[in-house]
Amino acid sequence: MKYRILSVSLLTGLSACQQAPSPAVLVDTSPETMAIVTSVLAAAVDRAQIELGPGDPAREPVITVLPPRPGPREGSSPAMPTHFDIVLMDGDCYVQERETGEMFFLTGIECRSASAD
């Protein structure tokens, strides 16, 4: 019984240290920064090359990865864009896949709270 109480206390203490993700925007959208973001997103959707949808990640906390273009023999494609939310958690910048909730760390990328606008 003591072990169970100690385990619950320890887990509660550890989870209290971690903040919930909050909406964020990128501080810098230079070509170098966007190249890093694009490579993280490409790995997240498991594609070598991606095209980002419209929007300004320095103003909006969302980045959209467009689906691959239909091939020459395809009339249309049922593929949908993949939406990622830019989030700040414990001072670090991540993109969170909206449908699955999976988080991807943006190494070396600086974000700020979206509510600071």
Where are these regions (language model features)?
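Bacterial signal peptide processing site
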Residues: 18-20
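Second-shell loop/turn segments in exported
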Residues: 23-28, 83
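Bacterial N-terminal signal peptides that target proteins for export
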Residues: 1-6
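C-terminal partner/receptor-binding element of secreted or periplasmic proteins
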Residues: 90, 99-117
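C-terminal motif of bacterial Sec signal peptides marking the signal peptidase cleavage site
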Residues: 13-16
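Mature extracytoplasmic domains of secretory-pathway proteins
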Residues: 31-92
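Short linear proline/tyrosine/threonine-rich motifs used for host-factor recruitment
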Residues: 95-97
